[in-house]
């Protein structure tokens, strides 16, 4: 009886994971529908993803943020990669360049999620031009 009245309540971590997954899905749709020209919704998908990461950057830089310093530093490094990849996509659009953004979003969502979605780590040797850090995929 009461089941229809029960509303799903998400924790902050679950909400953040859902937002990252949703953005990853939009980026994947752009990649999957890319023809000889970039999809019309690519700029919006990139803008949304960049906005999400800008908010994350601001939160990570907040002195009141309780996360361990090492974790904050690593997440900030990923945010710089997201910034660079987004700029690269704007300047020289190519569908395969979306993969890194999708992988990062899904990897972070996995870490936030209470229900894992299959995180695996890509060895740094397989991630050219982004330094020696391993990237979650």
Where are these regions (language model features)?
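N-terminal intrinsically disordered, cationic/polar leader segments
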Residues: 1-62, 72-137
